[in-house]
Amino acid sequence: MTNTQINDKILELANYLKIDNKCVAHNARLQSIQINGAVIKNFSFKLFNEYKLSFFNCKFLCEINEAPGFFEIENPVYIYGCTFEENVISYNIKFKSNVVIAYCRFNKNFYFKANTFCNSSNFERNFYNYASFKKSHFEKNVTFYNST
């Protein structure tokens, strides 16, 4: 991928997330895009199909509600130190790579229903409200750290 193509993808992603593109960095060695310290006003887990994305210390102001309709996510999901101000609801997603959601704060509901996790997953966080993994299927290790 050329620098122009990378810059175009970063701008496209920043526009979709409704963030300042200065919060977005590309790591060519890891072939990934990192979003650092952004205030995010639009989001979908489907983004992980197109990019290897990592979110660090971001604030999500939007509800994340992946409506019923099965889809697969090929790339890893990495979300560290983020705050979710609205509900995070996920239905029928098959996560085919690692899922790491670490040291995040969920100020409303965190609800995963009928998802499949095909690889090792780490959920290191505190729950301040309601959390449910109803009918979710984990094919490999799942670790909860410091959960209350």
Describe the residue ranges of each PLM region.
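N-terminal leader/targeting and pre-domain segments
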Residues: 1-148
